[in-house]
Design a protein with these regions (language model features):
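Outer-membrane beta-barrel domain signature
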Residues: 2, 54-60, 101-106, 137-144
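Residue-identity detector for glutamine
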Residues: 3, 11, 21, 93, ...
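Flexible, surface-exposed loop regions and adjacent strand-edge segments
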Residues: 41-47, 96-100, 146-147
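A short secondary-structure junction signal
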Residues: 80-82, 90-95, 130, 139-141
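Detector for outer-membrane/organellar transmembrane beta-barrel domains
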Residues: 119-167
Length: 167
């Protein structure tokens, strides 16, 4: 009571299809890293808790404000390239999950870059690799810049009722 209200959104962007199979979006979007960040509803992972990697290292659910190019290079081979607000880790924080910010209040003195290639040309198979880099994860508030780079690859294969996933 007596506090201002707040609305939280995961996604709010404008997307422009500037060429066949290629688009640019600007706004608030989910970062294209990991297996479940973009589709993170409970039926996309096993159990009631997310796995430790996509909970603590890849901070799913992770969204940022920025701009991103997406498209299909060839049938079944797609790309995503984004420049966006980055994580903000204060002194003593070390988990990327702790660095997520509310975009409306985000410190964005140092932008981050993310890229992903994803292969889905074979039915039932997904291969992907992502990289996310930020020159200063302290957003200029530390005594020196602390850079961070996150590499991720994964495979998901499904045949009938059998599924194999590796991250």
């Amino acid at each position: 009571e007596g506090q201002p209200g707040e609305v939280e959104l995961e996604q709010a962007y404008i997307e422009w299809d500037f060429a066949s199979q290629h688009s640019l979006k600007a706004g608030l979007f989910l970062i294209p890293v990991g297996m479940i960040n973009e589709t993170h509803e409970p039926n996309t992972f096993y159990g009631t808790e997310r796995n430790s990697v996509e909970k603590n290292i890849i901070p799913a659910t992770w969204w940022e404000g920025g701009a991103a190019f997406s498209g299909e290079i060839n049938e079944g081979l797609s790309y995503d390239v984004a420049a966006h607000s980055g994580l903000f880790l204060e002194s003593g924080q070390y988990k990327p999950r702790d660095g997520r910010q509310k975009v409306g209040k985000a410190k964005a003195d140092n932008i981050a870059f993310t890229g992903r290639l994803k292969y889905t040309a074979i039915p039932g198979l997904e291969l992907a690799a992502s990289v996310q880099h930020q020159v200063d994860m302290t957003q200029g508030e530390g005594s020196e810049a602390v850079s961070g780079t996150l590499f991720e690859t994964h495979i998901a294969w499904q045949r009938d009722d059998f599924q194999l996933r590796a991250l």
